[in-house]
């Protein structure tokens, strides 16, 4: 199982991360490692595009919950984009869609919206 992670720093406060592949017990540590770099910064907006993620299990959810908690403690934001219906349902069933900001409009990653 492969995962691809691309990071684009738009400026010091806005970071876009594009993830493609499957997020499971095998690949989640790679995603976690990529996010940890930004979890120590204050006042940032970390935007993660999951448009190309075909599968996620509870390990992946745990990575995003951990990132959300760390970022919130530092007055930073986590925003998820481009979830498939299946992925969104996973966040919805677990109640995480009420806590973590989710925007399903893929084009918003290219705009100025945080």
Swiss-Prot record:
A Pfam family the protein falls into: STAS
Residue positions, PTM Phosphoserine: 58
UniProt domain STAS: residue ranges: 4-114
CDD domains associated with the record: STAS_anti-anti-sigma_factors
InterPro entries, alphabetized: Anti-sigma_ant, STAS_dom, STAS_dom_sf
Gene3D superfamilies: STAS domain (3.30.750.24)
Protein modification: Phosphorylated by RsbW on a serine residue.
Keywords noted in UniProt: Phosphoprotein
UniProt key word Phosphoprotein: yes
Molecular function via GO: anti-sigma factor antagonist activity
Function text: Positive regulator of sigma-B activity. Non-phosphorylated RsbV binds to RsbW, preventing its association with sigma-B. When phosphorylated, releases RsbW, which is then free to complex with and inactivate sigma-B.
Family to which this protein belongs: Belongs to the anti-sigma-factor antagonist family.
Record's protein name: Anti-sigma-B factor antagonist
Lineage of origin: Bacteria, Bacillati, Bacillota, Bacilli, Bacillales
Gene designation per UniProt: rsbV
């Amino acid at each position: 199982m492969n995962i691809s992670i691309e990071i684009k720093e738009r400026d010091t406060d806005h970071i876009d991360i594009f993830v493609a592949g499957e997020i499971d017990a095998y690949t989640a540590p790679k995603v976690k490692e990529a996010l940890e770099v930004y979890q120590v910064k204050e006042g940032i907006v970390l935007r993660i595009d999951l448009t190309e993620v075909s599968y996620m299990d509870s390990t992946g959810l745990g990575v995003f919950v951990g990132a959300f908690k760390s970022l919130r403690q530092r007055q930073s934001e986590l925003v998820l984009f481009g979830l498939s219906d299946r992925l969104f349902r996973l966040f919805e069933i677990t109640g995480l869609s009420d806590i973590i900001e989710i925007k399903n409009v893929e084009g918003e990653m290219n705009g100025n919206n945080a």
